[in-house]
């Protein structure tokens, strides 16, 4: 069975990618990060997801991105924006963008993949993300993959490392639809940037707005708790 390293956040996208990778038949080694994020409820959801998908091994890596700040997710001095209409969400890079986060996460995943002998890395970036987040764009992923094959021992030996982005051409609506077909239980996920202490989602941050809109377009109620 082929090994794969998967970046897992505890959100709907991660759950869908987990289901897709399991369907293909990969032995999944997952990795999550405690990076000082405001929405660390996602780490509690991760524990439920890895049980559901029989993950071979899961690692939670501690990184202090609060040392840099620069994002509403890692800096208490920057407020998480809230919206009342999904169509009012701005198209520029939002303050919830964490500088170089995917580069940092993928670098850890790459190192882990080398150690366990995996040549496949999965990340759940998609169309809705790439419109707002520069490190979710297809050209970024291709560039990182090229770097990975130049910078690793297995890469220079001709054993190609592949960064898989199975959601890259999907909208959030399509992701939810795909997950539902695969039997994903979205009750065990959270997307909110600013959940309450009991893990209820706020319902009007960027992540919540996009998620709620996706479930609405699939004519199904989002099963998680909202304030």
Curated annotation (Swiss-Prot):
Residues the record lists as binding ATP: 8-18
S-S bridge residues: none
Cofactor: Zn(2+)
Transmembrane spans: none
One GO biological process term: queuosine biosynthetic process
Domain of life: Bacteria
Pathway in which the depicted protein is active: Purine metabolism; 7-cyano-7-deazaguanine biosynthesis
Residues annotated for Zn(2+) binding in this entry: 192, 202, 205, 208
E.C. designation(s): 6.3.4.20
Enzyme kind, highest EC tier: ligase
Biological role stated in the UniProt entry: Catalyzes the ATP-dependent conversion of 7-carboxy-7-deazaguanine (CDG) to 7-cyano-7-deazaguanine (preQ(0)).
Protein name: 7-cyano-7-deazaguanine synthase
Species, as recorded: Rickettsia akari (strain Hartford)
Gene name for this UniProt entry: queC
């Amino acid at each position: 069975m082929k090994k794969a390293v998967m970046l897992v956040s505890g959100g709907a996208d991660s759950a869908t990618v987990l289901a897709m990778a399991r369907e293909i038949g990969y032995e999944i080694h997952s990795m999550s990060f405690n990076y000082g994020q405001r929405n660390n409820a996602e780490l509690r959801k991760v524990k439920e997801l890895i049980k559901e998908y029989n993950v071979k091994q899961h690692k939670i890596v501690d990184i202090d991105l609060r040392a840099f700040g620069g994002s509403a997710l890692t800096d208490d001095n920057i407020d998480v924006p809230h919206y009342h209409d999904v169509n009012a969400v701005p198209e520029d890079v939002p303050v919830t963008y964490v500088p170089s986060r995917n580069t940092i996460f993928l670098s850890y995943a790459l190192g882990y993949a080398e150690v366990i002998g995996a040549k496949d890395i999965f990340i759940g970036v998609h169309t809705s993300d790439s419109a707002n987040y520069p490190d979710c764009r297809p050209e970024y992923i291709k560039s990182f993959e090229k770097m990975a094959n130049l910078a690793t021992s297995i890469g220079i030996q001709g054993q190609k490392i592949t960064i898989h982005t199975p959601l890259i051409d999907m909208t959030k609506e399509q992701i939810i639809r795909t997950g539902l077909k695969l039997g994903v239980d979205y009750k065990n996920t959270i997307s909110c940037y600013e959940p309450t202490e009991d893990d209820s989602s706020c319902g009007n941050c960027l992540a919540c707005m996009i998620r709620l809109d996706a479930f609405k377009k699939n004519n199904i109620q989002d099963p998680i708790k909202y304030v």
